Design a protein with these regions (language model features):
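N-terminal active-site segment of His-dependent metallophosphoesterases
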Residues: 1-81
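Extended active-site neighborhood of metal-dependent phosphoesterases/phosphodiesterases
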Residues: 84-150
Length: 150
């Protein structure tokens, strides 16, 4: 039997500042998240992009067949963060059996993120469901199969 190598990642919290995000977007719980990021967590995630690049090299070196990311690409779920995360994660999306993802709570941080569909716009291609009859809310939960079935 062949071995399938799976790389699972989560909680990369990529951000590159908040260019183009209106100040009014922070007059809610994002201001608390921004303060937490600025005063406590920013150093933890300071090299997140470089770590994702290293993960891509590791994935290729180890021959990962499938890459799964279970969310929290972002810190505050803004559209620029999600777009930036999609750009940085790109090298991981080419595994032979594919790349599969679901958003984390930080990716859907506030109602504006969900209503605007920012995560779906940037990552929707990786969340398709292959068994739609089991979905209960549109395409949720996304169900994917990989490899062979008995």
């Amino acid at each position: 039997m062949a071995v399938t190598k799976v790389l699972h990642i989560s909680d990369v919290h990529l951000e590159d500042g908040f260019p183009g995000v209106p100040l009014k977007s922070f007059i809610n719980k994002r201001i608390v998240g921004l303060a937490n990021l600025h005063f406590r967590r920013r150093t933890v995630f300071a090299e997140a992009a470089q770590k994702v690049e290293a993960l891509a090299a590791f994935s290729k070196e180890q021959g990962a067949d499938l890459v799964i990311c279970t969310g929290d690409y972002t810190a505050l779920g803004t559209e620029p963060e999600i777009a930036y995360a999609r750009k940085i994660i790109e090298p991981l999306t080419h595994a032979p059996l594919g790349f599969f993802t679901v958003p984390g709570n930080h990716d859907l941080y506030l109602r504006d993120t969900v209503e605007a569909g920012w995560f779906d716009q940037h990552f929707g291609a990786f969340m398709r469901t292959e068994i739609p009859e089991h979905a209960v809310d549109g395409v949720w939960p996304p169900i994917r199969g990989s490899g062979s079935s008995p």
